[in-house]
């Protein structure tokens, strides 16, 4: 009866059963093999499943990406259904398996990576309650072992559910396993299990030469024998217990005294800042010249510990149980046994110089689902050395008896939970800085190491003066900085707080703000006015457009000091920067005036009181303000020569929440009170400190735009383009523009487009007869023109339409001496002279001649005054000729032609390359009438250059193949002479050896008894001789051994056989064997024969004869 545990089920992405693949070789249907399942004990490591399937079977079409794969674990490995998702497929072919498809899969529970948790904070929850909360809304449900009831708390903020599940096991413990329930047709349940443990301590033993196929020990880390412990940094207080704002150094154990006589584990005198263990010193200490042993120290810290007595207890416990332990993992291949992931096993291999005798957990397991009876490869970790068990148990018993009374009463050590810390209101974050960056804003603050502080919160909003809520939290954690990812040119406002372990929050910090930066360039900065737009006569009608509806319509956006005037008790100044900053300062005199401010100038020559507004239209005023000590900025208004209109700016009556030393963007919408082009803006505020101290503020980036859309700042076209009043005395010095700057005819027709100069720009009778010269009125100005009006002269710039134009020579009208072109008879000719600038100028020309017989193109130089052809191409008589400069030695030529039209000679096509007029390579394709066959010949007799084929050369013939040099040496292939069908003899040389013996170049074929193990030969078999040195152990007996895993010294597809030979002194006292081999290398053992201990410490040279398949 077929085992269902060897089947795998394929379901669609929508989980419809598509087909079943079988792992039984003799069963019908679509077969799969090498179903390798690797599962780690930790959910943080990725489980993988990969299998091969028969690609020639029609049902293999279902093995595609995103489809699901289900298999049932063999009972000895758990018996649960497991589900995976296909993430990659690869097609292949081999002689052994034919066409196949390889599918690589990842665990199906990884779909939880697509589910997102914004903010979940299970507090004081059991594992079942916490896991249910995390999986809420997903297709998975949690199942926790009833024995796991430890309550804990954790925060899951902006993470995927997959990440949250991994974090869950780190906080609440337990062992992870994902399973499904499957009835053979559909999935009825998906489960994330938290088990008390996986596997069991069932005493399974694996021994060398009995159960263990191979074993590797990996040791990392260095054990320490003593620690320098440090705890928390405590808040400093005065004599009354009030916090002074400072913190102590990290607490240490200098003042703690331990005495073994008093029941302590070890002796530790006062003044000693470290704690060590004498037993560890004896085992791991470093020997000194005087015979003493020196501790191996390291730093150890737990900032949650606030007393020296608790600190030394915790440090010593960690020293004994963790810090003094090396990290050891074992990779073991074992014969089939009833062992599962998580089992505690005993491994025995005493043939190592340092015998392996250990007890360890299975932390990773790999087996094949189609042949589980072959056993598994397991990886072991976190072991307990059996030689140390008795000593450690004794030490633990002694320590327990000595400290039983202390530990029964708690000994001053309690479980550290969130509730163990004082519920003290923490101070708000200090030294907060906010830095603008491109598409982000970085915040930093001082980190407070106090043990009772759980972390910090950052609140953010685009609204100034916002009240922080949980929805505004963008960061929560125990760090001293955070980068907030935002868009370009965005303004954000921030407030920060500190939180303790009881969720008690500090007072909020002041509000901070910043605007993310954008990349500035001249187009942004100067409105895309570049040098080519300011060239002579380059200002045309389309550049004097007056349609500024989409831009900043406020004249004065440059914030020039002369563009504004002061109200009473006010003065202003401008700081020149990338964006000018206008400072408005109150001047306090004997009056009680509180209001101060400025307005746009309305007097020539700096008049900016000319902003156009339409009654009823909504506009948006935007600017940035740094308030300094001003808290009321509500005196913002529109100004006309005869009237003032206050803007609704109640939000600016109290701006005390704005940072005093940072710019904050302000956006105000208003409706135009009337239609006029004489508006400007006024900016002002009120002194709210009783006129004790003068107030001031700074503005920049002022703009007014039509509509309600808030846009990035841009300069006003009224300030940077040529419009009425845009150029005034600030830009024009006395007599700076005079007649010398306006040359005759400098304003030509190109600069005066249709209607560009309107009546308003032309005075009465400004154009008179004196300005209309002879022939100044062209055909464009004449509506009709008949032939009788043309009696002589030249016809310029017109179109001639008709059926026939006759003439001996036609030339285009052009005004460039560098260009020549004409049509004459059967000839069309064009020539262009050019000059290349790039270092020394080089004069060149391009010449084209087209006749009825051919086309000639010439590229040449003319630096000497005489044309010198450099490259020439001619197409004539159906042939192509290309050459370099024929005046140069060794010039190059390429000729391509055919003579199919020649009835005398046989048809022939030729491709010829020449150097200096001599044939260097000819490729002929011709018909030979004598043998009656088509032939191709390559002739390179006049060259010593070899032929190079970068990616290979395939030569195929229906008959014989001969490759021969001039002296008769070469290779001759003649299938017709073979005695065995399908074989080809490769001959080397002309006559072979004496007696007519022909040596084969290479021959080799593995028997099926070999290919059934290693796979069939796909390419060539080759032989390699290789040498490797083996250094024998310096200690042991005459049976000592040494092995090496030797990677292949070449790329290979497979290794079929390795023959080792030991040579040199004492080589007759050892023998070499090969224990394993694959395409990745082989393992060789050199063992003593028991006849001599002279092999110890000796280096043996081992030579290998390797039969392999070329990759």
Swiss-Prot record:
GO terms for biological process: entry receptor-mediated virion attachment to host cell; symbiont genome ejection through host cell envelope, long flexible tail mechanism; virion attachment to host cell. NCBIfam families: put_anti_recept. Its main location: virion. Interacts with host Yueb receptor; this interaction triggers viral DNA ejection. Keywords: Host-virus interaction, Viral attachment to host cell, Viral attachment to host entry receptor, Viral genome ejection through host cell envelope, Viral long flexible tail ejection system, Viral penetration into host cytoplasm, Virion, Virus entry into host cell. The N-terminus is part of the distal tail cap. The C-terminus is part of the spike structure and is probably involved in host receptor binding. Pfam families: Prophage_tail (PF06605). One of its GO terms (cellular component) is virus tail, fiber. This is Tail spike protein.
């Amino acid at each position: 009866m077929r085992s269902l545990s060897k089947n795998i089920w394929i379901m669609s992405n929508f989980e419809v059963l598509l087909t079943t693949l079988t792992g039984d070789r003799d069963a019908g249907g679509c077969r799969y093999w090498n179903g390798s399942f690797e599962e780690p004990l930790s959910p943080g490591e990725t489980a993988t499943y990969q299998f091969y399937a028969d690609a020639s079977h029609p049902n293999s079409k279902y093995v595609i990406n995103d489809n699901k794969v289900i298999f049932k674990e063999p009972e000895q490995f758990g018996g649960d259904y497991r589900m995976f998702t296909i993430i990659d497929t690869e097609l292949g072919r081999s002689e052994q398996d034919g066409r196949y498809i390889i599918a690589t899969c990842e665990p199906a529970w990884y779909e939880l990576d697509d589910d997102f948790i914004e903010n979940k904070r299970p507090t004081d929850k059991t594992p079942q309650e916490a896991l249910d909360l995390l999986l809420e809304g997903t297709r998975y449900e949690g199942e926790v072992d009833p024995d796991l009831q430890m309550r804990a708390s954790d925060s899951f903020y902006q993470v995927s559910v997959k990440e949250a599940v991994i974090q869950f096991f780190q906080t609440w413990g337990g062992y992870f396993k994902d399973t499904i329930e499957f009835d053979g047709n559909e999935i009825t349940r998906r489960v994330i299990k938290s088990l008390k443990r996986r596997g069991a301590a069932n005493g399974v033993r694996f021994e060398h030469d009995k159960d263990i196929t191979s074993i590797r020990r990996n040791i990392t880390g260095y054990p320490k024998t003593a620690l320098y412990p440090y705890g928390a940094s405590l808040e400093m207080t005065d004599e009354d217990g009030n916090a002074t704002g400072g913190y102590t150094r990290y607490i240490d154990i200098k003042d703690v005294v331990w005495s073994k006589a008093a029941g302590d584990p070890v002796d530790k005198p006062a003044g000693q800042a470290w704690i060590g263990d004498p037993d560890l010193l004896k085992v791991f200490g470093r020997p000194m010249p005087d015979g003493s042993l020196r501790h191996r120290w390291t730093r150890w810290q737990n900032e949650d510990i606030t007393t020296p007595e608790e600190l030394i207890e915790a440090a010593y416990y960690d020293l004994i149980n963790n810090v003094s332990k090396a990290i050891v993992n074992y990779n073991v291949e074992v014969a089939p046994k009833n062992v599962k992931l998580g089992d505690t096993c005993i491994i025995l291999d005493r043939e190592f110089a340092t015998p392996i005798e250990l007890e360890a957990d299975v932390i990773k397991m790999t087996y094949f689902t189609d042949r589980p009876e072959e056993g598994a490869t397991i990886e072991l970790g976190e072991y307990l050395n059996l030689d140390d068990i008795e000593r450690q148990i004794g030490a633990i018993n002694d320590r327990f008896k000595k400290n039983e009374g202390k530990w029964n009463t708690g000994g001053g050590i309690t479980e550290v939970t969130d509730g163990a810390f004082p519920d003290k209101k923490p101070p708000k974050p200090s030294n907060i800085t906010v830095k603008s960056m491109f598409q982000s804003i970085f915040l930093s603050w001082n980190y407070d190491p106090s043990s009772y502080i759980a972390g910090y919160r950052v609140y953010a909003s685009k609204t100034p003066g916002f009240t922080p809520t949980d929805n505004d939290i963008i960061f929560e954690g125990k760090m001293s900085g955070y980068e907030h990812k935002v868009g370009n040119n965005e303004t954000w406002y921030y407030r920060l707080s500190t939180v303790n372990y009881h969720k008690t929050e500090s007072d909020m910090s002041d509000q901070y703000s910043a605007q993310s930066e954008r990349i500035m360039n001249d187009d942004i900065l100067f409105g895309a006015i570049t040098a080519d737009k300011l060239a002579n006569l380059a200002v045309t009608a389309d550049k004097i457009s007056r349609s500024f509806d989409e831009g900043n319509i406020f004249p004065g956006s440059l914030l020039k000091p002369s563009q504004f005037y002061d109200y009473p008790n006010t003065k202003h100044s401008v700081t020149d920067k990338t964006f000018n900053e206008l400072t408005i300062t109150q001047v306090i005199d004997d009056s009680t005036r509180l209001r101060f401010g400025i307005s746009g100038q309305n007097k020539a020559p700096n008049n900016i009181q000319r902003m156009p507004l339409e009654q009823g239209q909504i506009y948006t005023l935007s600017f940035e303000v740094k308030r300094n000590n001003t808290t009321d900025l509500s005196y913002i208004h529109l100004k006309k020569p005869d009237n003032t209109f206050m803007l609704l700016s109640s939000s600016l009556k109290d701006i005390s929440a704005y940072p005093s030393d940072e710019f904050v963007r302000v956006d105000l919408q208003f409706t135009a009170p009337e239609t006029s082009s004489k508006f400007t803006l006024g900016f002002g505020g009120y002194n709210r400190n009783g006129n004790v101290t003068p107030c001031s503020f700074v503005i920049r980036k002022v703009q007014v735009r039509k509509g309600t859309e808030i846009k990035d700042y841009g300069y006003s076209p009224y300030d940077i383009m040529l419009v009425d009043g845009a150029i005034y005395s600030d830009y024009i010095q006395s007599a700076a523009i005079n007649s010398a700057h306006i040359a005759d005819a400098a304003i030509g027709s190109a600069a005066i487009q249709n209607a560009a100069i309107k009546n308003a720009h032309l005075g009465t009778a400004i154009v008179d007869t004196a300005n209309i010269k002879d022939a100044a009125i062209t055909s464009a100005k004449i509506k009709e023109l008949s032939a009788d009006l043309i009696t002589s002269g030249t016809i310029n710039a017109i179109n001639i339409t008709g059926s026939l134009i006759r003439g001996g020579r036609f030339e285009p009208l052009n005004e460039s001496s560098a260009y020549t072109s004409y049509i004459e008879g059967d000839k069309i000719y064009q020539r262009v002279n050019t000059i290349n600038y790039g270092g020394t100028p080089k004069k060149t020309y391009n010449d084209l001649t087209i006749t009825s017989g051919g086309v000639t193109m010439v590229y040449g130089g003319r630096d000497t005054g005489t044309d010198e052809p450099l490259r020439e191409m001619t197409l004539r008589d159906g042939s192509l000729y290309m050459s370099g400069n024929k005046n140069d030695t060794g010039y190059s030529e390429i000729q391509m032609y055919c003579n199919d039209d020649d009835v005398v000679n046989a048809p022939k096509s030729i491709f010829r390359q020449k150097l200096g007029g001599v044939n260097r390579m000819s490729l002929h394709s011709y018909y030979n009438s004598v043998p009656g066959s088509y032939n191709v010949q390559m002739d390179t007799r006049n060259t010593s250059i070899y032929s190079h084929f970068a990616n290979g050369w395939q030569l195929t013939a229906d008959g014989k193949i001969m490759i021969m040099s001039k002296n008769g040496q070469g290779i001759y292939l003649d299938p017709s002479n073979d005695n065995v069908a399908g074989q080809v003899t490769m001959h080397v040389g002309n006559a072979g050896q004496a007696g007519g013996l022909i040596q084969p170049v290479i021959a080799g074929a593995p028997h099926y008894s070999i290919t059934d193990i290693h796979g069939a030969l796909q390419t060539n078999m080759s032989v390699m001789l290789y040498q490797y040195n083996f250094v024998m152990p310096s200690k042991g007996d005459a049976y000592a051994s040494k092995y090496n895993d030797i990677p292949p010294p070449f790329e290979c597809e497979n290794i079929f056989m390795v023959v080792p030979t030991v040579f040199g002194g004492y080589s007759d006292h050892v023998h070499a064997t090969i224990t394993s081999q694959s395409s990745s290398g082989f393992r060789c053992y050199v063992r003593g024969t028991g006849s001599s201990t002279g092999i110890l410490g000796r280096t043996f040279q081992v030579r290998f004869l390797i039969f392999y398949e070329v990759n």
